Design a protein with these regions (language model features):
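Catalytic core of non-heme Fe(II) oxygenases with the double-stranded beta-helix
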Residues: 68-127
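Non-heme Fe(II)/2-oxoglutarate
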Residues: 1-83
Length: 127
C-alpha cells in the first residue's frame, strides 16, 4: 500500500530541517546498504549517530506519531531512526528492496522493518 500524507511536518519544522541539513557533514550513503544493493546506491547520507540526525529524526518521529493517518495506517511499535539522504550531481539509488531486518542503533537489537517511509524535505521542482 502506498499512502501519501501531505504536510507531515509544519512549515517551521521543515525550515528547521532544511537549514540544519544545509550545514551538515555528509558521508557515503553505502554505509547503510546491504550487500545486494551496495552497487546501486550512489548518494550521500548523514551519519546516523550525528547530532543533526538524532535531532531531526526525533522531529520526524514526533510528527509521525502525532499524525492520525500515519499512526492508524502503520501502527508503529518501534521506530528506526530515519536515514537522511542527499542526492547531488546525478546521484541515485537504483531499483532495490529495503532491508527487511535492520539493527536499531540506540537499542542495539535487530528489528523487522514492516513499513518503510520516505519524507521529502524538498519540493518536487527542486529535483
Amino acid at each position: 500500500m502506498i499512502l501519501h500524507i501531505p504536510n507531515l511536518l509544519s512549515l517551521d519544522e521543515l525550515n528547521h530541517c532544511r537549514q540544519t541539513l544545509s550545514q551538515a557533514e555528509w558521508t557515503d550513503g553505502k554505509v547503510t546498504t546491504g550487500y545486494q544493493s551496495a552497487h546501486l546506491k550512489n548518494n550521500l547520507q548523514l551519519a546516523q549517530d550525528s547530532q543533526q540526525a538524532l535531532e531531526l529524526g526525533q522531529i520526524i518521529q514526533n510528527a509521525a506519531n502525532a499524525n492520525p493517518l500515519f499512526f492508524s495506517a502503520a501502527l508503529p511499535k518501534t521506530f528506526l531512526p530515519p536515514l537522511f539522504n542527499c542526492y547531488q550531481h546525478g546521484g541515485n539509488f537504483g531499483m532495490h528492496v529495503d532491508n527487511a531486518i535492520r539493527r536499531h542503533p540506540q537499542l542495539n537489537q535487530y528489528l523487522r522493518t514492516d513499513v518503510s517511509c520516505t519524507v521529502f524535505l524538498t519540493n518536487p521542482d527542486e529535483y
